[in-house]
Amino acid sequence: MSLESLFQHIIFSEHQAEESRRVMREVRSEITRCRGKIKKATEDLSEEKIKLESKVQQLSEKSFLLELLKTHENALERQLSEIISERDTLLQACEAIKNKTTEEEERFIKEITDFNDNYEITKKRDTLMKENIEMEMADLDSQADVLRREMKSVERNRGQLWELQKLKNELLQELFTLQKKLKVLKDEETEAICITKQLEAEKTKVRDKPQHDPECVRLKRELDLYKAEDMESVYRALQAEVDLLELALAPKDPQDSNSLSHEPPHT
């Protein structure tokens, strides 16, 4: 193979090295972009986790409060049932007393009237009896008013329980939405990690290319052949070109550059 053809191959190899450097830059740029995306996704995930934990804490507090209110509601309902039963009993007793009182009043008035007609006794006792009966009826009416007020209070408490149940449903819906967002962020993080691993593998493949590239191997064999034929000057020139080519094909790593700069010159 002529020296001119060899130089043409070296130039072609330099073009390949430039293409490899371009690919390496693109790979590094893509890795940087993916790392930024992973970092942002991780930060977003952390923020969403904090928000979700806060919402869960609030929901737990509201649930605990709701359970307490339910317990109170059950107690109030039992008390309401007892009050209603007692009210019905009292109303029945009141009605019976009213009927009995009316009958007794009519009978007593008739007896007093008859007795008065017979013996002409004053009617003050009749008036006093009526006043006592009216006072008893007023007491019964007052008890009925107290029962009605207690029933209205129970109805107001039930309205508050309905409002808390509505708030619980809204918090559960918001929790479901946050869980969906969290799943999307986890999927994006997994995808970004897979892309990063692929790019790292591509970077390793490009770094190892000079050791397995057929063109580099062939050039080294030709250098060995020239060295065997004692072509010292041609050998040194080709050796310098090969060193430059290997440097061009190798990844631009500061540690690699430092190690190459301390290697002894080839003879």
UniProtKB/Swiss-Prot annotation:
It comes from the Eukaryota. Transmembrane segments: none annotated. Residues 24-97, 128-191 form a coiled coil. GO terms for cellular component: cytoplasm; sperm midpiece. InterPro entries: CCDC172. Signal peptide: none annotated. Keywords: Cell projection, Coiled coil, Cytoplasm. It is found in: Cytoplasm; Cell projection, Cilium. Belongs to the CCDC172 family. May interact with TEKT2. This is Coiled-coil domain-containing protein 172. It comes from Mus musculus (Mouse). The gene is Ccdc172.
